[in-house]
């Protein structure tokens, strides 16, 4: 995390793709991409399982610019005692990253449910959010939870929480899903990054923003659609009943 922050705040340019995985996801990716069974495993000597973090990145653009970004990443990586795995893992990830979602429906047939929840954090509270949300995710026995950031900025980044659980009913799935969204709001993270806030996430939005800020949306809605005819019950929960809203932080009521 600290290395990623330093790279994004270096003012030397940004990688076009940038991803940092937590230890649980790192161990899974190194197995999925056959690093543990390839000659690259010798580069991992001294790195303990569940205590290592995988960083992937690309640079694009002018040759000089890309070279400068690469030099900065290499310098910061050395500072934090990282070790290069060549470009093999990046290429494996790039060519296989869209394959996993196709397994979702098949897994559901066997009672295995998986989903991705994302949030937005500042660098200053990233470690806290990661720890608190993962603690809630793992409170359910026999749960796989992987986490990574994949959209980084000088001010912060997103966090993806991907869980895999055994769940036979929609009610059970929604109950677990709700506990994670509760944890995200309590931790101080924004309830979404770029996936947006639809019907499922809407109850948590006002509790994150606060009534005054969220009230601006009500003013616009009342001006343009005072009868609430457009997309009722959807979008960001402007027509939610008070009892259905989630206010879980002491500093926002």
Please provide the spans of the model-predicted regions.
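C-terminal substrate-recognition/cap domain of FAD-linked oxidoreductases
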Residues: 2-179, 183, 187
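Activity-critical C-terminal alpha-helical subdomain
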Residues: 198-253
């Amino acid at each position: 995390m600290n290395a990623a922050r330093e790279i994004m705040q270096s003012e030397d340019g940004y990688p076009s793709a940038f991803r940092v995985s937590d230890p649980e996801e790192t161990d899974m990716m190194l197995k999925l991409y056959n690093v543990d069974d390839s000659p690259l495993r010798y580069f991992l000597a001294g790195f303990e399982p569940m205590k290592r973090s995988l960083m992937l990145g690309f640079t694009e653009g002018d040759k000089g610019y890309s070279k400068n970004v690469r030099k900065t990443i290499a310098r910061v990586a050395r500072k934090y005692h990282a070790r290069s795995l060549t470009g093999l893992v990046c290429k494996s990830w790039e060519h296989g990253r869209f394959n996993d979602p196709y397994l979702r429906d098949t897994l559901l047939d066997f009672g295995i449910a998986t989903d991705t929840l994302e949030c937005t954090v500042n660098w200053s509270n990233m470690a806290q959010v990661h720890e608190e949300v993962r603690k809630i995710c793992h409170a359910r026995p026999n749960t796989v939870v992987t986490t990574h950031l994949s959209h980084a900025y000088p001010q912060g980044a997103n966090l993806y929480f991907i869980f895999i659980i055994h769940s036979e009913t929609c009610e059970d799935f929604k109950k677990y899903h709700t506990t994670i969204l509760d944890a995200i709001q309590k931790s101080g993270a924004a309830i979404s990054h770029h996936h947006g806030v639809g019907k499922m996430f809407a109850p948590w939005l006002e509790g994150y923003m606060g009534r005054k800020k969220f009230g601006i949306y009500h003013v616009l809605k009342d001006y343009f659609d005072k009868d609430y005819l457009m997309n009722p019950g959807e979008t960001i929960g402007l027509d939610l009943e008070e009892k259905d809203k989630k206010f879980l932080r002491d500093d926002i009521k």
